[in-house]
Amino acid sequence: MKKIFFILFIIFSITNSSYAAGSSSNTKTTTSNYDKAVKLIKFAKKYEKKGKIDKANKRYEKALKLLLKSNKKKPNNADILNYLGFTTRKLGDFKKGEKYYLEGLAIEPGHIGINEYLGELYVATNRMELAKERLEILKGCNCDEYKELKEIIDGTKKSKY
């Protein structure tokens, strides 16, 4: 009988300590500034679709600040530059948006997101030939970005962003 209690005690002790090992209250999950910015941009897009432009712009402004920090920490990252271009464009600064997009393309010329968004910027600024150049780069990707930019250039669809 003593052996059974001893064995149960050992099993109980091992089980409790193994649960404790994976559930420390000191566990800290950190989200990067880039990830926070992407989340804010997604919320901004939703607000924009609902016509809540002021709320959308506040999210874009917050995202922009986080992306600038990310860019300082990790310069030459095409994804960060893509979102920097996107947020500045959404906030009405097409010149800065174009600058960020072009910096991103210098790093990764085939970046699908940058090519699409830069094409949309060119359409918005009435530079259709440059938009068509971006479309040509996307031609072989077999992706939604190509189809969307083509429709925007053709005038059959309005840019959602």
What are these regions (language model features)?
Residues 7, 23-31, 46, 132-161:
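Terminal, low-structured helical/coil segments at or just beyond the last alpha-helical repeat
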Residues 49, 90, 124-125, 155-159:
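Register position in tetratricopeptide repeats
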Residues 73, 107, 138-141:
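Structural marker of alpha-solenoid helical repeat scaffolds
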Residues 77, 111, 143-146:
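Residue-level recognition of tetratricopeptide repeat
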